[in-house]
Structure formats: C-alpha cells, structure tokens
Curated annotation (Swiss-Prot):
Family: Belongs to the SmpB family.
KW Magnesium (keyword) present: no
RNA-binding recorded as keyword: yes
Source organism (scientific name): Streptococcus agalactiae serotype V (strain ATCC BAA-611 / 2603 V/R)
Top-rank taxon, per record: Bacteria
Protein name (database record): SsrA-binding protein
Compartments (UniProt record): Cytoplasm
Major location (coarse): cytoplasm
Amino acid sequence: MVKGQGNVVAQNKKAHHDYTIVETIEAGIVLTGTEIKSVRAARITLKDGYAQIKNGEAWLINVHITPYDQGNIWNQDPDRTRKLLLKKREIEKISNELKGTGMTLVPLKVYLKDGFAKVLLGLAKGKHDYDKRESIKRREQNRDIARQLKNYNSR
C-alpha cells in the first residue's frame, strides 16, 4: 500500500463502482513540461484510462491531459500514451497476474508527491451488474445503520 500520498489532483470515481480492486501499485509518469503544468492545474481525466504492459514496459492509455494554455508549440497530443515508471520486478509481477485471469490495470488517482506526478494503479477485476447492485445495497444499509446510531446516540 502507498504510504504518504501528497496533493491528489484527479480521482477515478467510477473505478471502485466498475471494478473490484485487488491490489494497488504506485508508479511515476513520464510527462513533458507543459503536461506537468496541466496536471498541477488539475486538468487531467482518468475516466476511460487503463494501463498495459508491452515489451516489458508499462504504458498509461486513454488518460486525457488538457493542453496547457500558454504551451503553444510545446503542447503534446492530449490523449497520447504515456510511459509509467516501475521497477522490473514490479512489471514482471503485474504481467504475471494479468495473464489470462480477467484482470486489468486501472488508474485510481493521480497526485503530486515531492514535486513529481504519481499515479495509483489498481489491479482490478471487473464487476458484474449484480455485484454492483449488491455493493450499492450494502452501502445503503451501512448508511441507514449509521444514521440510526447517530439518532439513538443524540437522545
């Protein structure tokens, strides 16, 4: 698990709804100068993003970073694939877990840690519709219990 997370810039709110997160991994992102300025301004979208292992390297795909306003000619394509910085052992471990198991790698958060952009990846398994309904039902029951306890304790 990740210890100290710095300034959270973006979160993938649908990830916990659509997937069951098995494990989390912290990775650095290779960004250009104008991209890091956009990330610091919280102009990043993780909605449809995912990560993939190709040729022994990890890549972040479909993550949109809006071009920096004053970037003019140095701005990159907003939807380009970006390299993730992981150790070889971590990449091998992830690729072994991803092989033929129906698992995927989903970005959960992007945050700044000591001036560097980091992404929290979740090793995830997709949920079925009935799993989603069950988790919603469980969440509502917990809210009702908490509400009743609050009312009971305030008497």
